[in-house]
């Protein structure tokens, strides 16, 4: 849940002629991101988290729209059907085959929802909920937390924890039986877990949203307290 100093990292990369790609999966839709001011060259994010879209859709934003990236998948695009080569121009260059139209439409609705509610309002509400959850879990003797209480502007509304004597997957299965959805494991960030010393089993990650109710967090805290 800790926000890294992207601006400083981007400046360091550019100093040595390197470009920087930022995975904004946990921050897109929650905290403001200005690609021009931050120095981000490539920004990618999932659509099903803070942007409230469905799974199976994501976004890639290029700081320089003329930047020609290599492709992983190539195929028909419907725009240059006579050519046997992948188009050079975006976005067709990166959208081979039949695109996920339902996902794009749903993601657009999610982005519109975020824009209407306002990122500042979303961040304030979600971070308040995450802080409440962190305080509740911190009172439980067997719970280990890996960050300080989430505070602006250094955190996103995510709380990672473990329960002493239990694997993260065991905690997740237990909570799942109580209709509480969390994510367990390495969260696609093995290097971060190496830093935390949790690379063997990962952690339990609880993420809040604008739809999270305090009573739901109380249910999570209460369930963990029984372990």
Model regions: which residues?
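Pyridoxal 5′-phosphate
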Residues: 1-227
């Amino acid at each position: 849940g800790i926000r890294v100093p992207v601006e400083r990292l981007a400046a360091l990369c550019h100093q040595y002629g390197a470009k920087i790609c930022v995975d904004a999966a946990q921050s897109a839709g929650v905290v403001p991101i200005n690609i021009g001011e931050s120095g981000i060259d490539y920004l990618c994010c999932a659509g099903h988290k803070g942007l409230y879209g469905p799974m199976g859709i994501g976004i890639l934003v290029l700081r320089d729209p003329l930047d020609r990236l290599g492709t992983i998948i190539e195929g028909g695009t419907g725009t240059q059907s006579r050519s046997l080569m992948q188009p050079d121009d975006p976005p067709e260059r990166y959208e081979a085959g039949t695109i996920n139209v339902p996902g794009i439409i749903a993601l657009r609705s999610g982005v519109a929802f975020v824009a209407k509610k306002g990122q500042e309002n979303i961040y304030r509400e979600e971070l308040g909920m995450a802080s409440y959850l962190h305080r509740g879990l911190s009172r439980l003797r067997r719970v280990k937390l890996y960050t300080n209480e989430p505070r602006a502007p250094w955190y996103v509304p995510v709380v990672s924890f473990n329960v002493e004597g239990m694997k993260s997957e065991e905690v997740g299965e237990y909570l799942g039986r109580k209709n509480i959805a969390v994510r367990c494991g390495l969260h696609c960030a093995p290097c971060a877990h190496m830093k935390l010393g949790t690379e063997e089993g990962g952690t339990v990650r609880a993420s809040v949203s604008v739809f999270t109710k305090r009573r739901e967090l109380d249910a999570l805290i209460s369930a963990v307290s029984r372990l």
